[in-house]
Amino acid sequence: MNQGKIITVSGPLVVASGMQEANIQDICRVGHLGLVGEIIEMRRDQASIQVYEETSGIGPGEPVVTTGCPLSVELGPGLISEMFDGIQRPLDRFQKATDSDFLIRGVAIPSLDRKAKWAFIPKLSVGQEVVAGDILGTVQETAVIEHRIMVPYKVSGTLVAIHAGNFTVTDTVYEIKQEDGSIYQGSLMQTWPVRQSRPVAQKLIPVEPLVTGQRVIDTFFPVTKGGAAAVPGPFGAGKTVVQHQIAKFANVDIVIYVGCGERGNEMTDVLNEFPELIDPNTGQSIMERTVLIANTSNMPVAAREASIYTGITIAEYFRDMGYSVAIMADSTSRWAEALREMSGRLQEMPGDEGYPAYLGSRIAEYYERAGRVRTLGSQEREGTITAIGAVSPPGGDISEPVTQNTLRIVKVFWGLDAPLAQRRHFPAINWLTSYSLYQDDVGSYIDRKQESNWSNKVTRAMAILQREASLEEIVRLVGLDSLSEQDRLTMAVARQIREDYLQQNAFDSVDTFTSFPKQEAMLTNILTFNEEASKALSLGAYFKEIMEGTAQVRDRIARSKFIPEENLEQIKGLTQKVTKEIHHVLAKGGI
C-alpha cells in the first residue's frame, strides 16, 4: 500500500505525488472522503488518477491511498436480476444504505450481498483431480439460471473437501490441494480484473443464428451467437428500442444490458417493462436472466469508461459456464466521449475530432472479447458472447470516428434511417445500406436445420427491394403508370415486403416477436404471390385485374403478422389461396 498526496484536481482527473510504489491500473482511495479512482498514467512519482465519483470539494494536500489491486468485479451468485452502476456498486442496496436517491460519495458497498445464503449442490467428490474451469457444483440462482461454480483460473490439484448446504458468497465451500502442497480455500465468489479478458481453451467460428424475433434482422441482416453488431443511427431513429427488443426476445441464456451515458428514463423503462415480460423461450420473467448496468448521463463521466468493461467481464463469466450471452451497450459513443474527455485532460495528442489516437484499439479490445469459445476445464463445453453496440453519431453522420472504427471491427451493420423513422417505419433499419457478413453462414445453417430453401427466398426478396429502389427515381419523374406491367408488379410486391413484412410493431403483443417458422411462412406467401402474378402477366393477364382479383388474399397476407404463433397453419394455408385466386383471374380471361 502506497500513500501520496493530491497536487492538482481537474474534473475527474486527479494528479498525486509520492506514488513511486504504485502501478498503472491500481485502484486508489482519493481524498478524505475515500473516492474510488484508477491510476491511468505514471510519470516518475506522479500518478494521474481517473476518479469514478464526483470530485467537487477535493483539493491539493489530501491523501491518496493505493490498494495495490486493479479495478475488478465480483463474480458469483447474486448477479442475475441485479442493477449495478459502472463500477459494480449495487444500486438498490446503495439506496437503502444511504437513504438517498443519488450516489453518495465515498460509500463502499460490496457488489454481492454478503448476507444472502445460497444452496450449493456439489457435482464432484473428494479425491477427484480438478483444473481451472471445472464445474464443482451448482446454485439455483433464479428459476431459469443455474449458477455453475467453477475452479478459478490458475488453480488446479486434488479436491480435498467440498460441502453441500446453504452458504454466503464468502464462506469456504471447497478446498483444493495444489501441486506445490498448498491448500486453496474457495468460496462461491471469485474476482476478476475488468480490463483483462478471461482465458479460453479455443476460439471457434460462430455459425448458429441469434434469433431476435425482429423480421428485418433475422431475415436480411442476421447476427450469429458469438457475433458482433453495431446499431448506428441519429436521434429518434429507434436505437434503444431495437436494443430493448433484442434484450427481451433473443434466444440466449443471459442478457447483460449496459446503459452507458444515455438518459435515465431509458433504464427506468427497462426496470418497469422487463419484470412483466415473459421470455418466449422459458416462460419466465425476462429479469430472471438479465443483469443491468446503469451509468446514465447524470452519473460521473469517468465511470462510463469502466461500465463497458464491467459488462463484458460479467458476460465472459457466464460464457465460461457454458451459457450463450448477449451484451447490449447503449451507447458506445458516450463511452468514447468519456475517453475523449480523459485524453484531453491528460493533454494527449488528439486524433480525429478530438478523440484519442488509440480509440480504434479500445473499441477493438471490447468487441474482440465477444465470440464462440470452447471453455477451460476438463468437461467439454461451449459458450458464446454476442456483442451489440449502439452508436450515436452527431446528426446521424456515420463518417465520424466512433462509427467508422466500429464498422472496421463488427460484421453486422444495422443502419437506422431518419427518413424511415419519420415515415413511422419501425424498426427503421435501412435494407439498402445495412449489411451482415454472417448472411451466408446463417442461410446455410437454416437450410440444413429446417430442410428449406430459406437463403434462396431471402435473396429473391432482397432483389425485389433493390429493383424497387432503382425504379423509384423513374416513378418520381414520370409516374407509376409509365412503368411496364412487370415493373408495376415489382413495386407492389416490394411495398408488401416493406409494409407487411419488415415493418413491425414493438408494442403489439403478437407482432413484437416472430419466430423463424412464422417468418418463413410470411415471406413464402409474398414471394408466391410475386411468382404466380408474374406468370399470369406473361400469360396475358393485366396487372390491374390481378390486383383487384387478389385484394382479399393480399389483405389476409398483410394481417398475418398479427396471427399468433400457435395458429401458424393459417399463415401457411394462404400459399394455396394465393395460387388459387390468381388462377381464377386467369380463368376469367385476365382482361
Swiss-Prot record:
State any single GO MF term: proton-transporting ATP synthase activity, rotational mechanism
Q: So what family is this one in?
A: Belongs to the ATPase alpha/beta chains family.
The residues that the entry says bind ATP are: 233-240
Q: Name one GO biological process term.
A: proton motive force-driven plasma membrane ATP synthesis
* InterPro entries, alphabetized: ATP-synt_VA_C, ATP-synth_a_Xtn, ATP_synth_asu-like_sf, ATPase_a/bsu_AS, ATPase_F1/V1/A1_a/bsu_N, ATPase_F1/V1/A1_a/bsu_N_sf, ATPase_F1/V1/A1_a/bsu_nucl-bd, ATPase_F1/V1_b/a_C
Q: Which organism is it from?
A: Streptococcus pyogenes serotype M12 (strain MGAS2096)
Quote the catalytic activity from the record: ATP + H2O + 4 H(+)(in) = ADP + phosphate + 5 H(+)(out)
Which of UniProt's keywords are assigned here?
Answer: ATP synthesis, ATP-binding, Hydrogen ion transport, Ion transport, Nucleotide-binding, Translocase, Transport
Identification of the protein by name = V-type ATP synthase alpha chain
Signal sequence, renumbered to the chain: none
Mind telling me which GO cellular component terms the entry cites?
proton-transporting ATP synthase complex
